Amino acid sequence: MLFQLNIVFKELKNPDFFFFFFFFSLPLSSFKLNLSSSSSFKLWLIVFLLDFGEIMFPAPPLPIANFSGALLPLSLFLGFLDVDLIAAKALPLEVTTNRLSSFALIVSSSSILPPRISSSSFPPLLATFFLLKKMFPAPPLPTTIGALLFGDEVVACKD
């Protein structure tokens, strides 16, 4: 029996949590992917480095007005996602600069999960990840973290 993954986000402000959870849980869950521990770690490491790179060097948001029209073909392209979008009974969804308006995204595994993910599946996975990261750019780092990472001067607040 396939592992059922049902995630509901309302007022999604930081979709990085979803992508981290989904990609990280793929090799560790009961999905019948037949991934070896080596390839599982490589997949997780690639996604982690991509996400860290997006935080360090964020890409500008893409002007996408129809979220459902963009995501559903991607799910069909990947071939193993069953995606339903609910947005206050109104589609298409309006995408603002750094966030989406109120909506719920329900992702569940379907019966068309492939029995195995081979190395040929990595390019579409990575391409989809990049596109989704551009659609939902990560929020900017807090000033103190940015100062620690980039060596800017940190001004301490006095009590």
Swiss-Prot record:
Topological relation to the membrane, as annotated: Multi-pass membrane protein
Localization of this protein: Membrane
Keyword vocabulary terms for this entry: Membrane, Transmembrane, Transmembrane helix
Signal sequence annotation: none
GO CC entries: membrane
Source organism, top-level taxon: Eukaryota
Transmembrane stretches, start-end: 17-37, 44-64, 67-87
Note: Partially overlaps YDL173W.
Name of the protein: Putative uncharacterized protein YDL172C
